Amino acid sequence: PELMVEYKLPVIMENPDGTPRGKGGLQPDEACEFAKLLEGAGIDMIQVAQANHTGNMGDTIPPMGAMPYNWTLPVAERVKALVSVPVATVGRVVSVEAGEKILEDGAADIIAYGRSLMCDPDIALKAATGEPIRECLNCNKGCVDAIQNRKYISCVLNAENGDEATIAIKPGEGDKKIA
């Protein structure tokens, strides 16, 4: 059987002040050239992501306010213009509407949700059925800080995250007013 191979392209993005963010990856121009080589080698998909070999998770997965929404998208757009394989983007794409706009604009082929899925693992189903989606705050409390401190992952907005096997939260019966 064939196996799809995705390459996560580590790019050193820029902070809002123009300084490099993280270490150990490719500059955007290098990433674009490397993406063409990857396609030529037969890769099936490329995910443009932040590079980080600093040991600081905040460099890779910035907390709210540290980076703009969709912050890896400019490099993903450049890569997509150069290759014919699908290109994914990741990085503070916090709503389904934002992801749909990126896809509609042709800026990327796939949205790689990360923290959003920890916050609401049913995001795709809810988007399809019109149910309200719990949107990630990008607070990094329970997810990124837990990884950094080698603890189990949780989410401040999703009480079940990390305890799915032991907690079964069920909807209450009838309408209730809760203060």
Model-based region annotation:
Residues P1-A179:
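Flavin-dependent oxidoreductase catalytic cores
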